[in-house]
Amino acid sequence: VAAAPADQSATMSTVTIKGEVFALNLESYGEFGEEMGLWNNKISGIDLSKTTILNNLNLYMNPIRTLDVSGQPFLLELDASYCELKEIDVTHNPELRSFSCYGNSLTSVDLSKNPELLVCNVKVNQLEAIDLSNNPKLEEVNVANNYLTAIDLSMLPALGKATLMNNELTTVDLSHNPELIDVSVGGNLLTSLDLTVNKKVQMLSFNDNAIRSLDLSANTDLYKIDCGGNGMTACELNDFFYTLPQRAQVVEEQPSANLTLL
């Protein structure tokens, strides 16, 4: 693939990849990126049929609209975010570790053939459901800004970061995710949340739900909480405050010792 001209833009229609290419970065940052000296590609298509050994493919913010990675059995990382995609097939990529496909128009995604997946970011799509039962190694899941009414995380024991905000979830079961550190469930329809098993949680956001009480006394690693927009009365907020893990001593040199309540 030829290098972009000095203005950091590469305007073309379809790119054909040939030969022994292990990693390919064609990420773009649009007009704003161009102003900052970053890439502004305008690739509308990519042909990968003449190479089969890709490990890493980054097509971020190129208007390709369709993408065929079925001939890439060794693909480890794929970023097809903001590519105007309505569908994508990754069932032929069994080694996939990182899958980023956010900011598209996906209504479904099949991850049943990706058992090695560690990171899944499909935020800002049109998903109404997602099945993660065949991805037991997942450490990070981001499904924010979709239309999910339910999500099953029970088969993800290694999950450390769950970003589920701005969906239509009425319940979230985190009792099988003891490694969670970062939990974001704001902007849903939750009335309760149980984090008694999640003793490693450090950051918690459950704003804009209908949660009127929550006992976090066992979550002693917490240092940041966003609980706004739940309709708590002054008394309920006061009761909630006194369930928070208290710091016996705050050391100025360690700001993380402070508990921030938003």
Residue ranges and their predicted role:
Residues 24, 36, 55-59, 76-80, ...:
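Conserved hydrophobic beta-strand positions in leucine-rich repeat
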Residues 46, 67, 88, 109-111, ...:
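Canonical leucine-rich repeat
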Residues 1-52, 56, 71-73, 94, ...:
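N-terminal capping/linker segments that flank leucine-rich repeat
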Residues 177, 182-191, 195-212, 216-219:
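Eukaryotic tandem repeat interaction scaffolds
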